[in-house]
C-alpha cells in the first residue's frame, strides 16, 4: 500500500498513543513520533525505543520546559489567571506550548498531518487543534477518538489492551491507577475512573507532587520572591540562603518547597468548553505560591482603577487560555494590555510556606504607591480630614435620591 503521507503524532509512550501509532501505520501513514519534555516524570529514552520498535519513522524528543515557563506560565502569573475562581490552568497552558512544537516539526519534516490522542469529550482536542490551525492553516488533523472507525473499534481500555497484545505493543506491567493523570512542570491533574463520582473523596495515595499537609514539616519555609514587571526573577530561602534566579531553576525550586509543605491541592468541578461539567483534582505547588505573592506585590504597586481593569482582563485571559484561544487576536491583545499593566509591578514579597498554606509576611518595592506618612493614624501628612466631609456628602447624594424614590414607591 502506498503511503498517505507523513503524520506527526503527539506521543506519550502510554497505551493510547502507542495503539494510535500502530493504527495510523495500518491506515497507511508514515508516523513521526513527537514527545514533549514539559517537566513530567518520564523515561524519554525508553519511550523513544518503544516508538521506533512500533514502527515510527522518526522520533523527536523536544525539551520545551524553559519556553513553557517563560512564554506561558509567566504571562499567567502576571495576569493572576484563575479559571472559575480556582483552577490555575496547568494543563490549559501546556497544550499550546506542546502543539506549537508539533507544528514546527511537521513543517520541518514536510508532514501534511498531525495527530493526537485527546478524547472527543474533552478540552484538549480543542486546544491542540486551534493552535495547529492558527500556526499552520493548511495542516490536516487526524483525531482518532473522533473517528467512528476508531472509537467503534476501541470502546474502552480492554479493547486497547487486546489490540496491543495482537500487535506486540508492550503493556505496562504495573497496575493502572483507577483514574487518569496528566503531568507537566506546572501541575498534575487526576480525572476519570473512580473520580467521576464527585462524591468520592480522593484516595490517600492519589497525590504525587505534594505531601499530605498534615504530615508536612512542623516548621515553615520562609521565602523572599523578587518580581520585575510582574515576573518572578529571584527566590531566596531566608532560612538557609538558597537562591535561584533563572526561570526554570526558580520554578522547580518553588515546586520542591511547596510540594514538601503540601501546597497547591484543589478538588473541583469545572465547566468544560465543550459544554459538560467534569471533576478534576489538581496539584499546582509553585503556581500557588506565585499566585499569592504576585497578587500581593501587584496590589502594593498598582493604581486602584488600573487594577480593576486588569482584573477583568485577567478573567478574560483565563477563559481564553482554558478554551484554547491562546493564538487568537483577542488573547494577543489581552496579553499586551496585561504586559502594560505590569510595568510598575516590581519588588520583593516574603511568604511563609507551611502545612498546605501560603502566608504573606511582608513586602517592599521602589515603585510602591503606599505612602506610610499619608496613611498613618499618628501623622496628618498632606491630607485635611475636613475634606472627607464633602467627599462623603457628594457620594451620599445618589443614595439619598434612590431611597427618596423608594419611599414614594413603598407608600403607594
UniProtKB/Swiss-Prot annotation:
One of its GO terms (cellular component) is neuronal cell body. One of its GO terms (molecular function) is argininosuccinate synthase activity. Acetylated by CLOCK in a circadian manner which negatively regulates its enzyme activity. Deacetylated by histone deacetylases. It comes from the Eukaryota. ATP binds at residues 10-18, 36, 115-123. Keywords: Acetylation, Amino-acid biosynthesis, Arginine biosynthesis, ATP-binding, Cytoplasm, Ligase, Nucleotide-binding, Phosphoprotein, Urea cycle. It is an enzyme of class 6 (ligase). It is found in: Cytoplasm, Cytosol. The modification Phosphoserine is found at residues 177, 180. Pfam families: Arginosuc_syn_C (PF20979), Arginosuc_synth (PF00764). It catalyses: L-citrulline + L-aspartate + ATP = 2-(N(omega)-L-arginino)succinate + AMP + diphosphate + H(+). L-citrulline binds at residues 87, 92, 123, 127, 180, 189, 270, 282. InterPro entries: Arginosuc_syn_C, Arginosuc_syn_N, Arginosuc_synth, Arginosuc_synth_CS, Arginosuc_synth_type_1_subfam, AS_cat/multimer_dom_body, Rossmann-like_a/b/a_fold. SUPFAM superfamilies: Adenine nucleotide alpha hydrolases-like, Argininosuccinate synthetase, C-terminal domain. GO terms for biological process: acute-phase response; argininosuccinate metabolic process; aspartate metabolic process; cellular response to amine stimulus; cellular response to amino acid stimulus; cellular response to ammonium ion; cellular response to cAMP; cellular response to dexamethasone stimulus. CDD domains: ASS. The keyword Oxidoreductase does not apply. The modification Phosphothreonine is found at residue 219. One of the enzymes of the urea cycle, the metabolic pathway transforming neurotoxic amonia produced by protein catabolism into inocuous urea in the liver of ureotelic animals. Catalyzes the formation of arginosuccinate from aspartate, citrulline and ATP and together with ASL it is responsible for the biosynthesis of arginine in most body tissues. Indirectly, may be involved in the control of blood pressure. Belongs to the argininosuccinate synthase family. Type 1 subfamily. Binds and is activated by Bj-BPP-10c, a bioactive anti-hypertensive proline-rich decapeptide, part of the C-type natriuretic peptide precursor. Homotetramer. Interacts with NMRAL1. Interacts with CLOCK; in a circadian manner. Forms tissue-specific complexes with ASL, SLC7A1, HSP90AA1 and nitric oxide synthase NOS1, NOS2 or NOS3; the complex regulates cell-autonomous L-arginine synthesis and citrulline recycling while channeling extracellular L-arginine to nitric oxide synthesis pathway. This is Argininosuccinate synthase. The lineage of its organism: Eukaryota, Metazoa, Chordata, Craniata, Vertebrata.
Amino acid at each position: 500500500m502506498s503511503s498517505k503521507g507523513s503524520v506527526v503524532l503527539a506521543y506519550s509512550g502510554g497505551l493510547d498513543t502507542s495503539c494510535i501509532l500502530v493504527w495510523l501505520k495500518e491506515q497507511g501513514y508514515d508516523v513521526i513520533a513527537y514527545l514533549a519534555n514539559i517537566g513530567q516524570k518520564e523515561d524519554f529514552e525508553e519511550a523513544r525505543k518503544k516508538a521506533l520498535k512500533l514502527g515510527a519513522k522518526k522520533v523527536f524528543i523536544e525539551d520545551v520546559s524553559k519556553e513553557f515557563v517563560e512564554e506561558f506560565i509567566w504571562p499567567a502569573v502576571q495576569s493572576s489567571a484563575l479559571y472559575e475562581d480556582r483552577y490555575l490552568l496547568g494543563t490549559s497552558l501546556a497544550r499550546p506550548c506542546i502543539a506549537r512544537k508539533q507544528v514546527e516539526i511537521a513543517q520541518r519534516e514536510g508532514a501534511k498531518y498531525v495527530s493526537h490522542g485527546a478524547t472527543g469529550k474533552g478540552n484538549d482536542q480543542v486546544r491542540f487543534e486551534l493552535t495547529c490551525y492558527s500556526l499552520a492553516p493548511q495542516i490536516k488533523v487526524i483525531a482518532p477518538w473522533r473517528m467512528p472507525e476508531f472509537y467503534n473499534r476501541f470502546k474502552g481500555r480492554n479493547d486497547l489492551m487486546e489490540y496491543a497484545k495482537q500487535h506486540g505493543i508492550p503493556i505496562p506491567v504495573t497496575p493502572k491507577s483507577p483514574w487518569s493523570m496528566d503531568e507537566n512542570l506546572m501541575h498534575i491533574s487526576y480525572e476519570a475512573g473512580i473520580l467521576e463520582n464527585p462524591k468520592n473523596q480522593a484516595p490517600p495515595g492519589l497525590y504525587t507532587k505534594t505531601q499530605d499537609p498534615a504530615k508536612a514539616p512542623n516548621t515553615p519555609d520562609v521565602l523572599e520572591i523578587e518580581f520585575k514587571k510582574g515576573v518572578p526573577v529571584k527566590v531566596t530561602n531566608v532560612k538557609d540562603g538558597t537562591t535561584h534566579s533563572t526561570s526554570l531553576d526558580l520554578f522547580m525550586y518553588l515546586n520542591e518547597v511547596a510540594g514538601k509543605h503540601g501546597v497547591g491541592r484543589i478538588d473541583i468541578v469545572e465547566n468544560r468548553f465543550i459544554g459538560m461539567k467534569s471533576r478534576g483534582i489538581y496539584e499546582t505547588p509553585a503556581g500557588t505560591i506565585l499566585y499569592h505573592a504576585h497578587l500581593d506585590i501587584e496590589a502594593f504597586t498598582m493604581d486602584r482603577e488600573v487594577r480593576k481593569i486588569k482584573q477583568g482582563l485577567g478573567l478574560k485571559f483565563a477563559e481564553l487560555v482554558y478554551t484554547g484561544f491562546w493564538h487568537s487576536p483577542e488573547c494577543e491583545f489581552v496579553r499586551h494590555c496585561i504586559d502594560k499593566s505590569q510595568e510598575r509591578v516590581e519588588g520583593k514579597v516574603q511568604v511563609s510556606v507551611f502545612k498546605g498554606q501560603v502566608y504573606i509576611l511582608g513586602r517592599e518595592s521602589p515603585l510602591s504607591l503606599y505612602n506610610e506618612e499619608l496613611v498613618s493614624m499618628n501623622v496628618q501628612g498632606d491630607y485635611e480630614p475636613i475634606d472627607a466631609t464633602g467627599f462623603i456628602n457628594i457620594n451620599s447624594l445618589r443614595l439619598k435620591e434612590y431611597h427618596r424614590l423608594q419611599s414614594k414607591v413603598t407608600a403607594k
